Amino acid sequence: MKRIAIRVVPAAALLALGLAWMSRRVAGQATGQPSTKNGEWPMYTADLKGSKYSPLDQINASNFSKMEVAWRFKTDNLGPRPENKLEGTPIMVKGMVYATAGTRRSVIALNPKTGELKWVYNMDEGERATRWAPRQLSGRGLSYWTDGRGDERIVYVTTGYRLVELNAKTGQPIASFGQNGIVDLKVGVVIGKDKQIDLEKGEIGLHS
């Protein structure tokens, strides 16, 4: 029962935090939002409705068999060991592809035409991420946010449960967010009677 309490209570707290954070973010996205209409894929499920649909029609049943691989990007070196599977969904915004990759869950920005690496960001969290994290590898993906006036950010969660905001153009952490671009999602999560969970070994729930 104690293990259940550790997982469920923090998950509820994180959900409330996530909804509050997202409501503020969405409120600031009234204009200039990317869309699948121009050939891009700006969100994990395409759009806020989760449609998973693109209106593009250049690829269809008649020409699908003629498609060829344009380029490949290997992620073997993005972590202490190679990753055997990739379950995340890359996004494409304003002519740039963003994805999480490798066993350290790095964030990469690629030129969609050539596959050229534009920037990469990763965090070495030690055993908190490699030994104690229940969900490792590259994860399911990341998010893009903009205020519509030039401030563009990539948002993701590390394997060690840290929420990170990066400058979408440079890959540098946003200094004004949390502590130099990072919010430790374990800090402030308690079990029992006001007992802070172990920041290294403590396990919390996290859902999109």
Where are the language model's segments positioned?
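Bacterial N-terminal signal peptides that target proteins for export
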Residues: 1-12
